[in-house]
Amino acid sequence: MRSFLLTFACLITFNLFAQKDYWQQQVNYKINVTLNDQNHSLKGLEEIEYINNSPDQLSFLWFHLWQNAYKNDNTAFAKQVSRDKKGTDRLKKFKDRGYIDSLDFVVDGVKATYETDPKNIDVIKLILPKPLSPGSKVKIKTSFYVDIPEYISRSGHNEQSYMICQWYPKPAVYDRKGWHAFPYLDQGEFYSDFGNFDVTITLPSNYIVGATGILQNADELKQYKDIGSKNVAADSRKNTVSYVAPSASIKSLNYKAENVVDFAWFADKDFVIRYDTLKLNSGKVIDVFTYHHSNGNKNWVNSIEYVEDGTKAYSSYFGEYPYPVVQAVEGPKNEMSGGMEYPMITLITSPNASVEMLDAVITHEVGHNWLMCILATNERTHAWMDEGINTYYQFRYEADKYRYNSIFGDQIPKDVRQKPAPEFQELVY
């Protein structure tokens, strides 16, 4: 396998050398957003710095408004889901639709207009007041409003539990092959530019939040760490330490993340926080958080172990984990997947998972920090480069730790499970 990876890395390197003057765009964000948990909505103001590193002059930018994918049954998302009976049943139960609107673009101080893609209401073209030259940058501001849908696919709410993903107006990728503006799909993931995020979330003070990046509110972060450490030390679901909300009715939490491809956040009043630190082989120490429900899957009591073991394993496979924090969040059941990854944080949607399966799903989603977040390939076009390689290494992790494979589960004969890890993996993979 090492020889395969070396060959694969060399091919990528040679390909990059063959590309004259390689470039990629950079998109930096400053977002202020307020959660209304009475009508399940977001009201936001977004400032984008778009840096044109391409050799081309750009007269417009394509944007994704992926929350509009939930708006009606005519979107690419709805059409894809409805292709089978299970999906049709999902849509029939989907009553609380969502959308994004109230956009008001200003580009370098000049009001700008946009056009909705004729085929996809979750894709728009922003017309720049003047062309953006190579090597130049532009400041884009817009307000936005999101009616948060009930949870059905990655983003949404389950009563007053919030999974806020693909939630802000986001420029599509422009690379050497041109624009990659595509609609949101249930089966089919993403392609995003790298950038820095400065996100302030205002919400009722009794919510616990997990998000991409580092929490800048020192008092809030200290309380999360203190509570989480005590809950890990207790090693039990009983007598967990609870979060104490500030006296004010609302709070504003600021998160910063550097050189990432996306930003997601999760908020719930019922989260049990668990926290530890992990020392990597280089001596670097990172924060490890998990957030789970008090009445959820009992196996989350060991979730810190799963995140840490997965992070250590993938650091040995691919190179050291590059970010300052790694987190996992327990979410509601998703009919189509066991979890969904975002930079530094992952949502796990497998409420009935066994010990081995929960460990496998958490490790798989944490593993995407290397493949989806660092390599940042076009997942819509080349899904195997993320999911395929990641699944192989997930199976390797399962074999090493449990002599387990999440496809075959308990069907694996006992004598096979007693074999050494390499032989076990050869037999079941």
Report each predicted region and the residues it spans:
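Acidic/His/Gly-enriched intrinsically disordered linker/tail segments
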Residues: 381, 387-429
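N-terminal, polar/Ser/Thr-rich
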Residues: 17-43, 55, 158
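Short, hydrophobic/aromatic-enriched beta-strand segments in well-ordered soluble domains
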Residues: 46-48, 52, 65-67, 136-150, ...
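Hydrophobic helix-coil surface modules that form long, contiguous segments used
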Residues: 174-175, 179, 189-363, 392
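Glycine/proline-rich low-complexity spacer/linker segments in large multi-domain proteins
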Residues: 73-86, 145-197
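A surface-exposed beta-strand-loop module
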Residues: 51, 86-160, 240-248, 253
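Catalytic Zn2+-binding segment of zinc metalloproteases
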Residues: 369-382
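Solvent-exposed beta-hairpin/edge-strand motifs
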Residues: 63-110, 164, 202-207
